[in-house]
A protein has these predicted regions:
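Short, intrinsically disordered N-terminal pre-domain segments
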Residues: 2-4
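Acidic, low-complexity, intrinsically disordered interaction modules
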Residues: 6-116
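Mixed-charge, Lys/Arg-enriched low-complexity segments
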Residues: 118-123
Length: 123
C-alpha cells in the first residue's frame, strides 16, 4: 500500500493507494486499528472489496472516446484499472484508471488529478 500526503483547501490528509488484494488487507487492518467499529459504520466495505477484486488489472473501453477506425470497425480508447485511492474511509473511494498507452506511475496520475492539484508528496 502506498501512502501519500495531500494538501488541499481543507488542510492536509493521507491518501492511501491500493493496487493489490494484499494492499486491501493491510488497509483494512489499519482501519480496524484506528476504529474498532469501522465495519459497523462502513457496511459497504466488503462489497467494494469484491468490486476491487473483480476490476483491478482489467482493461475496459471507453465507448465515448473513439481512437480510430480500422477496417470500418471502431477502436476505442482503452483504460486499465490500476488502483483505488481513499483519503477518508468513511467517505468516497476513487478508481485510478490509466490509458493503456500511458506509462506514468500512480503518483504522477494522482498529482495530475483535480483532487490533488494543490500538491502531493510521498509521506
Amino acid at each position: 500500500m502506498e501512502t501519500y500526503r495531500m494538501k488541499g483547501i481543507y488542510g492536509e490528509g493521507d491518501v492511501y493507494v491500493l493496487k493489490t488484494i494484499e494492499d486491501w488487507d493491510e488497509y483494512e487492518k489499519l482501519c480496524r486499528e484506528r476504529n474498532s467499529d469501522f465495519l459497523k459504520y462502513n457496511p459497504n466495505f466488503f462489497s467494494l472489496k469484491e468490486d476491487f477484486e473483480k476490476y483491478i488489472g482489467k482493461v475496459w473501453q471507453d465507448k465515448e472516446q473513439l481512437r480510430y477506425t480500422y477496417n470500418d470497425e471502431p477502436v476505442y480508447v482503452e483504460y486499465k484499472v490500476i488502483a483505488i485511492e481513499d483519503n477518508n474511509p468513511m467517505m468516497d473511494w476513487y478508481w485510478i484508471v490509466q490509458n493503456v498507452d500511458d506509462d506514468r506511475d500512480v503518483k504522477s496520475i494522482l498529482a495530475n488529478s483535480c483532487d490533488l492539484k494543490n500538491g502531493i508528496k510521498i509521506k
